[in-house]
C-alpha cells in the first residue's frame, strides 16, 4: 500500500476538498496563512478565521505590523482562536527570530528550512511543514491527527511523525502525471501534497466519528487494507 493508492481512492470517491481555505477558495494572504499555522492549534477553522478578521480590522496585515504590537494586544485580537495568551507569545517569538535572521519575506520563503522553524518555540513538525509547503511552496507533505487516523485504520502503526509522512508520500512523486490526469489539472508536486492533505482532512471530518468509520468510509478504505 502507498500514499499514491490512498490519494487515488479519495479522489475516486469524490471527496470534496474545495472548501479548504488554502486551496480552491484561497482568499487568505501569505501573512494570514503564516499566522494561521499557530492559530489553528487546538481549535477549529471557523475560530481561526474570526481571529484573522480581527487582525485585518486592526490593520495587522504583514509581519512588520507585529513589531510594534505588544503581546497583550495581540492576544486580545486572536482571542477567538483559544489559548490566545500562549499563541500570542508564540507569534511574537516567531516575529523576533524572523527579524534576526531574514531581511524580507521573499528571502524567508527561499531560505528558511525545517531546522530553523523547529527552533521557534511553539512550532512543531506539523506547523513547520505547513509553512514549508503552503508558504514556501516546498515539496513537503503535512501529516496530522487525521493522517494518523487513516493510517491506523489501514493497519499501519506509525512510530514517528516523519515515518507517517514517508508512508503517505510513498509513490506520489513518481505518479505525478497519473494524479494530474485523475484531478484533471496540472499540479506541481508541492500542490499535489497540498491537495492530498486537504483530501485527508475532508475525508476524516466527513466519515469518522471518533474512531468509528462510516459505512461509506469503510467502502472507500477497506479495499486498501493489507
Segments from the language model and where they lie:
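Phosphate-backbone recognition surface of nucleic-acid-processing proteins
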Residues: 133-197
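Catalytic DNA-binding helix-loop module of base-excision-repair DNA glycosylases/AP lyases
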Residues: 34-40, 91, 110-159
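Short, mixed-charge aromatic SLiMs
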Residues: 57-68, 114-122, 165-178, 221-226
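Short, well-ordered coil loops that connect the C-terminus of an alpha-helix to the N-terminus
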Residues: 16, 45, 61, 123, ...
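Noncatalytic linker/hinge segments flanking ATPase motor cores
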Residues: 78-82, 105-109, 130-135, 170-174
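N-terminal polyanion-binding entry modules of DNA glycosylases/AP lyases
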Residues: 1-109, 181-226
Amino acid at each position: 500500500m502507498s500514499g499514491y493508492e490512498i490519494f487515488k481512492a479519495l479522489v475516486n470517491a469524490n471527496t470534496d476538498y474545495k472548501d479548504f481555505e488554502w486551496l480552491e477558495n484561497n482568499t487568505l494572504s501569505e501573512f494570514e496563512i503564516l499566522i494561521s499555522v499557530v492559530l489553528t492549534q487546538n481549535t477549529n477553522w471557523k475560530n481561526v478565521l474570526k481571529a484573522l478578521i480581527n487582525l485585518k480590522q486592526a490593520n495587522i496585515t504583514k509581519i512588520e505590523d507585529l513589531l510594534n504590537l505588544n503581546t497583550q494586544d495581540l492576544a486580545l485580537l486572536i482571542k477567538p482562536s483559544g489559548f490566545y495568551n500562549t499563541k500570542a507569545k508564540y507569534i511574537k517569538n516567531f516575529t523576533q527570530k524572523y527579524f534576526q535572521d531574514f531581511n524580507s519575506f521573499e528571502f524567508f520563503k527561499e531560505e528558511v528550512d525545517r531546522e530553523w522553524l523547529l527552533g521557534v518555540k511553539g512550532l512543531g513538525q506539523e506547523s513547520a511543514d505547513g509553512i514549508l509547503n503552503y508558504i514556501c511552496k516546498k515539496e513537503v507533505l503535512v501529516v496530522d491527527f487525521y493522517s494518523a487516523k487513516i493510517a491506523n485504520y489501514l493497519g499501519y502503526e506509525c512510530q514517528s511523525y516523519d515515518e507517517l509522512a514517508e508512508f503517505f508520500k510513498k509513490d506520489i512523486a513518481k505518479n505525478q502525471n497519473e494524479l494530474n490526469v485523475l484531478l484533471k489539472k496540472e499540479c506541481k508536486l508541492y500542490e499535489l501534497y497540498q491537495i492530498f492533505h486537504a483530501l485527508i482532512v475532508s475525508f476524516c471530518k466527513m466519515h469518522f466519528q471518533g474512531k468509528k468509520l462510516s459505512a461509506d468510509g469503510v467502502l472507500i478504505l477497506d479495499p486498501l487494507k493489507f
